[in-house]
């Protein structure tokens, strides 16, 4: 919490003393302020206010306190926030302007004799306490004597606080009262204490107007209205960004269906590729099986062929032998040339065997064959008989 600077001054015009100076003290928070009624010089204090009363001044008056800290009754009265004190005020600087409208009733002074300038003395003030962020100020009372224009002014207190959170400090109402006087325009001016708060959070600054209680006097104008105009720096506030915020759960829920669809598509593509590959493999294996089956059959046929070749060869040989040297019958060359036919399918081989049988029957039924068979038999017998005598010869030769 920033430093609290309170500026409080009271000006009282008394007809019994000469014009002098009164001091404006700046009390610290938590310490009571007591001002004694004695003339003080401006050397002892940092801020001094001088006033010269004019008993004959009439008409509307607007009082203001300029920052020069010296005023006259007819000059505008300015309450300067941030007058020269021991410690400077923190930024932002806030000014409070108090303007008082006086009624148009002319001021009447019952005494014809003029009085010399009276000193301005400060009356006793109540204690000023600060408790829990609330400023309370007891209402001081001033008294005027017989004549003159008693003017009571109370300088407003300034309180500036800077914080980030929490409500600002509340303000106390400053009320001044003037006692009854015989003559002169009793004027009571009260300026409300101003409080500004700069922060990011918390309610704005609240202000209460000071109460004015003019005393009853014989004559003289009285305060009709008080205008309180305050210039404050605006409080800073943080605006939320307009970008919509998405919950991560909603994002995950939105992404879940997309992930499921992608997974399903990937599975479908993989299954389709697997089926195509399997079908292609089946086609390749079927062609291989068919080709292998043909080869196996060919191998079996080729193996069966050579196994049956000697039998058919023997038949052909016998037929050729039966034909003899005459050339009737099938020569060996034809048999050898017909061997490749035996390596074909069984049907063709059977048909070939049938044709051979028919040829044998035809050759056997022909008369020429019978005539020819006889010499063949005879020749065979001769051939058989021929070595028979050799055997005895051999035997005979072997015997001796």
From Swiss-Prot:
A GO term, aspect molecular function: heat shock protein binding
Q: Where is this motif: Nuclear localization signal?
A: 282-296
Q: What is its main location?
A: membrane
Q: Which domain of life is it from?
A: Eukaryota
User: Which residue spans belong to the Cytoplasmic compartment?
Assistant: 277-400
Q: Kindly indicate whether the keyword Transport belongs to this entry.
A: no
From the UniProt entry, list the residue stretches annotated as the region Required for interaction with EZR, MSN and RDX and for co-localization to microvilli. Answer: 278-308
| PTM field | Glycosylated; has a high content of sialic acid and O-linked carbohydrate structures. Phosphorylation at Ser-355 is regulated by chemokines, requires its association with ERM proteins (EZR, RDX and MSN) and is essential for its function in the regulation of T-cell trafficking to lymph nodes.
Keywords (alphabetical) are:
Cell projection, Glycoprotein, Membrane, Nucleus, Phosphoprotein, Signal, Transmembrane, Transmembrane helix, Ubl conjugation
State the protein's purpose: Predominant cell surface sialoprotein of leukocytes which regulates multiple T-cell functions, including T-cell activation, proliferation, differentiation, trafficking and migration. Positively regulates T-cell trafficking to lymph-nodes via its association with ERM proteins (EZR, RDX and MSN). Negatively regulates Th2 cell differentiation and predisposes the differentiation of T-cells towards a Th1 lineage commitment.
Name of the protein this chain belongs to: Leukosialin
Record the organism.
Homo sapiens
């Amino acid at each position: 919490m920033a430093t609290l600077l309170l500026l409080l001054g009271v000006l009282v015009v008394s007809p019994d003393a000469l014009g002098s100076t009164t001091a404006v003290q700046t009390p610290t928070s938590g310490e009571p302020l007591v001002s004694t009624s004695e003339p003080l010089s401006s050397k002892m204090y940092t801020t001094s206010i001088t006033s010269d009363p004019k008993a004959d001044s009439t008409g509307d008056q607007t009082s203001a306190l300029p920052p020069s800290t010296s005023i006259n009754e007819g000059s505008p009265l300015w309450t300067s926030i941030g007058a020269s004190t021991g410690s400077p005020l923190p930024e932002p600087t806030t000014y409070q302007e108090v303007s008082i409208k006086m009624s148009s009733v002319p001021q009447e002074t019952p005494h014809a004799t003029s009085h010399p300038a009276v000193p301005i003395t400060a009356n006793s003030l109540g204690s000023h306490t600060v408790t829990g962020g609330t400023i309370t100020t007891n209402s001081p009372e001033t008294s005027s004597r017989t004549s003159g224009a008693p003017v009571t002014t109370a300088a407003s207190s300034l309180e500036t606080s800077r914080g980030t959170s929490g409500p600002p400090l509340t303000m106390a109402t400053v009320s001044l009262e003037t006692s009854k006087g015989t003559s002169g325009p009793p004027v009571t001016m009260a300026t409300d204490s101003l409080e500004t708060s700069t922060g990011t959070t918390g309610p704005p600054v609240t202000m209460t107007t000071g109460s004015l209680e003019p005393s009853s006097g014989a004559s003289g104008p009285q305060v009709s209205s008080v205008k309180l105009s305050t210039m404050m720096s605006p409080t800073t506030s943080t605006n939320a960004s307009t970008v919509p915020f998405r919950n991560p759960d909603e994002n995950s829920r939105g992404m879940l269906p997309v992930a499921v669809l992608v997974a399903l598509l990937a599975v479908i593509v993989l299954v389709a590729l697997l089926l195509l590959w399997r079908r292609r493999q089946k086609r390749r294996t079927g062609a291989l099986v068919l080709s292998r089956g043909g080869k196996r059959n060919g191998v079996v046929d080729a193996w069966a062929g050579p196994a049956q070749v000697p039998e058919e060869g023997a038949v052909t040989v016998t037929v050729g032998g039966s034909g003899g040297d005459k050339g009737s019958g099938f020569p060996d060359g034809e048999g050898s040339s017909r061997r490749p036919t035996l390596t074909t399918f069984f049907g063709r081989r059977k048909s070939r065997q049938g044709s051979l049988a028919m040829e044998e029957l035809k050759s056997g039924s022909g008369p020429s064959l019978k005539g020819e068979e006889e010499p063949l038999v005879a020749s065979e017998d001769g051939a058989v008989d021929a070595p028979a005598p050799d055997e005895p010869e051999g035997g005979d030769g072997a015997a001796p």
